[in-house]
Design a protein with these regions (language model features):
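Conserved SAM-binding loop of SAM-dependent methyltransferases across substrates and taxa
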Residues: 109-122
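S-adenosylmethionine
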Residues: 122-126, 130-290
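Amphipathic alpha-helical "coupling" segments that flank catalytic cores
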Residues: 1-2, 172
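A general structural signal for well-ordered alpha-helical segments in protein cores
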Residues: 26, 52, 56, 82, ...
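Conserved class I S-adenosyl-L-methionine
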Residues: 98-108
Length: 290
């Protein structure tokens, strides 16, 4: 067995022993927060920035051994991972009540789930990925982010900035397929917010997300509007599964950042319980969409 298949024994767990991400990372974070209008939010505070740094250090190191991301340059990690994740913060800040629960489907490198865990008043964040190596990374990165938040909460001088809601967030890596998590692990209609980024077609994403979302909860999918109206076609193609799985009318929210051209957030409310037949097995889903 190759060395790369043993990340638990050989890959680092402490981000503060690793090389800093550097000025390009910090500058891209600052620029992105400015574009998103978040400089006066918790996302721009020292605590949140420490979580971005800790997470990115581990991502860069682990990506040398396992396929987490092809994006390694610090400024691009900041822009294409951290800032892209935070692009939903203005929207989710209105939806995430104190103590809300969030699930990130296909979390992979921990984006967008971990930046949102550090900036929203959540009680639980689940990072779901069926690939074992990625789930082990998510566990390591989740622990690192949680440690930063816990340390901040114990420091009386920083507790006001961090907020008690951040201090008690439970971050869990879940090494399962979404289909298995829904019923075998008791997660059907368990989450206030279910998110996904770069997972698959919109129809696929919604069939996996809606069964995990509680009634009156919200699904958010990160998408891009390509030339030729690809997103409009995806929305039309997802109509039947939205109706069948209990979703409401989707809306498309443009991301107001010049550094993220064409980025969109597809948002819809869960209006009715999802029938037990959903999500269908992967083979059935693919066959029906041909």
């Amino acid at each position: 067995m190759s060395d790369a298949t043993e990340p638990r024994r050989e890959l680092p767990l402490d981000p503060w022993l690793l090389e800093p991400m550097g000025a390009a990372f910090d500058e891209a974070i600052e620029s992105g927060l400015t574009e998103l209008g978040l400089l006066d939010s918790a996302a721009a505070g020292d605590i949140a920035r420490r979580t971005y740094e800790a997470h990115a250090r581990l991502l860069r190191e682990w990506s040398q051994a396992i396929n987490l991301t092809a994006i390694r340059e610090p400024g691009e990690v900041a822009r294409r991972h951290v800032i892209d994740s935070l692009s939903a913060l203005p929207l989710l800040s209105e939806l995430a009540h104190p103590g809300a629960t969030l699930l990130d489907i296909g979390s992979g490198g921990g984006y967008p789930g971990l930046p949102l865990a550090a900036t929203l008043p959540l009680s639980y964040v689940g990072l779901l990925d069926s690939v074992g190596k990625k789930a082990r990374f998510l566990d390591a990165a989740g622990r690192a982010v949680a440690a930063v938040l816990a340390e901040a909460s114990s420091d009386e001088g920083e507790s006001d900035e961090a907020g008690d809601s951040h201090a008690v967030v439970d971050i869990e890596a879940i090494g399962e397929r979404a289909e298995a998590a829904t019923d075998e692990h008791g997660m059907r209609e368990a989450f206030d917010i279910v998110i996904s980024r770069a997972v698959g077609s919109l129809a696929e994403v919604l069939e996996l997300s809606l069964p995990l979302t509680r009634v009156d909860g919200t699904v958010v999918a990160w998408k891009r509007e390509e030339e030729g109206g690809g997103l409009r076609q995806e929305l039309r193609g997802a109509g039947s599964i939205i109706r069948a799985a209990g979703g409401g009318r989707p809306r498309v929210v443009p991301v107001e950042a010049a550094s993220l051209p064409g980025h969109r957030l597809v948002v819809l409310a869960k209006e009715r319980p999802t029938p037990p037949a959903y999500p269908r097995p992967a083979g059935v889903r693919k066959q029906r969409r041909r």
